[in-house]
Amino acid sequence: MLKMAMRLTSVTVLTLLAVPTFAQRETPRESPKDLPTISARTAAMTHYPGLLPLHWDAVAGKLYLEIPHLDASGQSADYLYTHGLPYGTGSNDLGLDRGQVSGGIIVHFQRFGPKVLLVQPNLAFRSSAKDPAEQLAVRQSFPESVLAGFKVEAATPDAGILVDATDFFLRDAHGVGETLTHLQQGSYRLDPARSAIALDHTKAFPKNTEVEAILTFATDVASRRGSFVDDVSPDPHAMTVREHQSFMELPPPGFTPRRFDPRSGFFPSSYRDYSVPLGDDMAQQFIIRHRLIKKDPNCTTSCEAVAPIQYYVDRGAAEPVRTALLEGARWWDQAFQAAGWAPGTFKVDFLPADADPMDLRYNIIQWVHRYTRGWSYGAAVVDPRTGEIIKGNVTLGSLRGRQDYLIAEALLSPYDAKGMILYEAENISGPAESASVTKNESPMLKMVLQRIRQLAAHETGHTLGLAHNYGASAFPHSPDETMSVMEYPHPYVTLGKDGIPDLSHAYPVNIGIWDKVAINYGYRQFAPKADEHAALNKIIADNEKTGFLYITDEDSRPLGSAHPHAHLWDNGEDPADELNRLIPIRAAALARFGENAIKPGTPLAQLQDTLVPLYLFTRYQAEAATKEIAGLDYRYNLRGDGQPLPEIVAPELQRKALAAVLKTLSPDFLTLPESILKVLPPRTPGLERTRESFPTHTGLTFDPIAAAESSADLTLATLFNPQRASRLVEYHARNPQVPSLSEVIQQTFAAVRDEHPSANLQHEVKMAVHARVIEWLLALAANPQASSEARAITRDRLIALKPTLLGNPTSLAEAARIDEFLSNPDKFVPAKPIEAPPGMPIGDDEDGNAIY
């Protein structure tokens, strides 16, 4: 997934534009007679020759920037400008990671007498007309931005000018302070006394100039409010990071733009053209991709590139993870070969020891540590004049692997009393002789490395221009086949010998079928006289004939989304069938769960943390199955492309899905066995609850009823989503054979009704879930986002339920809640959900800020 301004998200890409400058200016080039020449002014300084030469005054602690080759109007060339964080905060909540890079902008310097301005033209609005008056009308219609101002310190006629850029490079270019304020962490201010130019990473090269600064953000006790900085900074009153700023030469001509197609699987780079004919679309969209040109334009297969696409893996990752990152990212060469390129066209190596990962010349795969587990993402700097990717920047969170290891421990309960592993990596479905916990014999590590390879390929795919494809896993395939690395994969688990979960096929290897289709669309170079438009349409048409789906984020992430096959962290052609397959696997793993899930010497209370991913093992498959209810099967249709038109999910499939989903609300599913509860003591000193812990109503002790409520709420949040409820009303009106909202509510109550109450834990769980169902229906009835008919039907069902509740002494509180709503619906406040521990990486999901 891309982060901040830089993330390619699931999802808007910040772009870099370069078009002619804006307003006409009257700016004399002549320097005042009292200005020294650049060579005279910088004679005692340390020089950094390059694109924009730097001069360091060690005595004054100032950094001077030389701006060469101003034109007759006093304007410089255009440059690509970016900023980033070589040293981050380590806080997933703050979202300020090591290696983060902004999206980049086009800027130029403009001299006005003794002053120089750094100007960012407004390049989102353009004119393709050849008439200068038309172009000027567009430029004058929208504002530009002046990012900084400088005083001319020296000038050399016909050579350039010198400015003091110290304050510019010591500013908070990346917006760290703004982020802290936005997240209500307190009033942090940039402290110049505790900030300095970092000369160790300040460099100038022929095509780029790089400057790094040490910046300290300070606050006092009174203004501190949040805890995120406290979690990661040794002194929360002074948080010091590094910010990096880059100026880069724009790429040369020779790159051919390629039109965006919503079926292609690529991200678009967009701008508005105000000169297109009336009736034509003003929005101009091109896919984003790297420059890749054949040595021989007439070559058709195994073609050599003028310059291969080269990526580098951060050496900061330890083995065996480092090699797994390399191997996974290299899978993409398979897709390029399938698109007609020679082996080695896409290359991945370890980063040279003397290379700076912040340097815009390097495509980088970085390994980042955080306080809590969070999203990985693929970012890119893009020039939308052509859609060319200038730099790919992958950020991989190191705690992802540890979470996967925890999932494997929970599924396997793999340790004997001496800490030896009971199952071999190559045959973890059956017992084996005990072995030491080593990388060669750990089935947990084997699964983690499988996932790390896939993750490296996934995030690298974003930096090649590819969006997510959440429909890929619905295509029929074997567990060993990769449909797309651009999916969010759930580990494929089976039950092996003696009822032991088998993880040997958790994640497949190699690039996916869809990935080859997408790379073929984006990177195949056609013969010079070929009809590219027709050839690209054929690539998509051939894929459509196979029935392979491409459905991305906006149709997959929301709980109220409608597509029956586009989901996150799911498997299987039929979501309900896959949920029914997983439920007994979860039950088998829970039956074996106990002390063997943690190593000897570990506090038993830590079993609570290990239990979380196992107890909630089916959460995303249940969500996927729920989306079949009031589901709509559709494609990204273009007129005349022959793809199937939207179709409501068949009634029998909706009812099958409902039956499967309601199993996750049953007491058999939700009630933990006594064998587990008796080995879950309260948490020990130093092992406090975190957001990764189950909620509790019981204080220090583990609360199995709250755990059940939190799991039930995951199902109910999707099932009674207001958009889904509104579609149930609409689709039933269009086809009376499909389930109605009333039917879904009735079936849900039937599943959680306690027909034979008894004094045991299952009864208490069932009562708690029954109460949660009522709360979710009250919330639906009061939700203005639901249609009026959906709210009315829900209200009627609650009224019909009330007599049953009044006849049961244990349900009087629920009846009172219904009365509270009916007496004053406008002022009714729904109860908060019982929040389950996060399943996805912690932090913003792809809400438009990022691509993970």
PLM features: residue spans?
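Bacterial N-terminal signal peptides that target proteins for export
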Residues: 1-10
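Bacterial N-terminal signal peptides
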Residues: 9-20
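Auxiliary tRNA-acceptor-end handling modules of aminoacyl-tRNA synthetases
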Residues: 25-317, 335, 342, 350-443, ...
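Soluble non-cytosolic domains of exported or imported proteins
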Residues: 100, 315, 319-327, 359, ...
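Solvent-exposed, polar/charged alpha-helical surfaces in well-ordered, non-transmembrane soluble domains
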Residues: 323-330, 334, 450, 454, ...
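Sec-exported extracytoplasmic/periplasmic mature domains
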Residues: 330-341, 461-462, 466, 491, ...
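The catalytic-center signature of Zn2+-dependent metalloproteases
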Residues: 349-371, 450-504
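Conserved catalytic/binding loops enriched for acidic/polar residues
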Residues: 472-473, 480-852
